[in-house]
């Protein structure tokens, strides 16, 4: 049970609910990955059950969002079956003042970037702890890599000034494996002064599938905050 002593969860629930209310009947919805987005999927299911939403279909960005959508009764489709997506709702690990993002804490950033970039509107849901002045301040930058290219990619990233390390599993022996069967390298940069340039440079390394920089993609940021002991949602557009 959630209590008032758990402000982070309260913020995530509130912003997840606000994001679900952005969805209208008949929409195709990109379903993001992460703890805040999980509440959004739950609230979408509740709106469908109450009849307040009808005829929506979700496109999941990960195995996690697929499982949650099925659990809460959100119908699913695929990019093969639709040629238009009304809205994508997803979380982020960092958000800078220009609405650029670092994503990939859940190792799903490749699928997330595909879905989020295809949507007509991309809404980001975060709690206030994810707001930073400069990307890379608190979170390492994830890079998805084809396994055979891991060592060459590490060397190339070091030449770009990064400090890379392979992400290892928790309660699992060995590295994290993505839904695509690849590895994730988490990279520390002393300063990410030009996120757009770095995003392109990393993706130009042979063996890199995608990195967690999302530059110029987000349309709206919904931020969960605590004001006078109560959770509120602030909109950055």
UniProtKB/Swiss-Prot annotation:
- Name of the protein: Ribose-5-phosphate isomerase A
Which positions in this protein are listed as binding substrate?
Answer: 33-36, 90-93, 103-106, 130
Q: Which residues form the active site?
A: 112 (proton acceptor)
This protein's GO CC annotations: cytosol
Q: Which HAMAP family match?
A: Rib_5P_isom_A (MF_00170)
Q: Name one GO molecular function term.
A: ribose-5-phosphate isomerase activity
Known role: Catalyzes the reversible conversion of ribose-5-phosphate to ribulose 5-phosphate.
Top EC class, one word: isomerase
From the UniProt record, give the pathway where this protein acts: Carbohydrate degradation; pentose phosphate pathway; D-ribose 5-phosphate from D-ribulose 5-phosphate (non-oxidative stage): step 1/1
Ranked from the top, the taxonomy reads: Bacteria, Bacillati, Cyanobacteriota, Cyanophyceae, Oscillatoriophycideae
- For this protein, the Enzyme Commission number is 5.3.1.6
Q: Which gene encodes it?
A: rpiA
Q: Reaction catalysed by this chain?
A: aldehydo-D-ribose 5-phosphate = D-ribulose 5-phosphate
| Quaternary organization | Homodimer.
- Name the GO terms of the biological process aspect: D-ribose metabolic process; pentose-phosphate shunt, non-oxidative branch
Q: Which Pfam families match?
A: Rib_5-P_isom_A
**The entry's keywords:** Isomerase
């Amino acid at each position: 049970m959630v209590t008032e002593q758990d402000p982070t969860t309260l913020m995530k629930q509130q912003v997840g609910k606000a994001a679900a209310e952005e969805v209208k009947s008949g929409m195709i919805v990109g379903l993001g990955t992460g703890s805040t987005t999980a509440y959004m999927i739950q609230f979408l299911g509740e709106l469908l059950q109450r009849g307040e939403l009808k005829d929506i279909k979700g496109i999941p960005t990960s195995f996690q969002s697929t499982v949650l959508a099925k659990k809460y009764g959100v119908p699913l489709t695929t990019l093969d079956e639709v040629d238009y997506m009304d809205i994508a709702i997803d979380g982020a690990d960092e958000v800078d003042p220009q609405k650029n993002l670092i994503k990939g804490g859940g190792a799903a950033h490749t699928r997330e970037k595909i879905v989020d970039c295809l949507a007509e509107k991309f809404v980001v849901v975060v709690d206030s702890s994810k707001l930073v002045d400069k990307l890379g301040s608190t979170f390492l930058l994830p890079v998805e890599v084809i396994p055979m290219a891991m060592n060459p990619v590490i060397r190339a990233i070091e030449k770009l000034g990064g400090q890379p390390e392979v992400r290892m599993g928790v309660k699992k022996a060995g590295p994290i494996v993505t839904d695509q069967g690849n590895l994730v390298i988490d990279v520390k940069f002393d300063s990410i002064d030009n996120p757009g340039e770095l995003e392109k440079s990393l993706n130009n390394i042979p063996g890199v599938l995608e990195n967690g920089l999302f530059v110029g993609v987000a349309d709206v940021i919904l931020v969960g905050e605590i004001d006078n002991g109560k959770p509120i949602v602030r909109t950055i557009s």
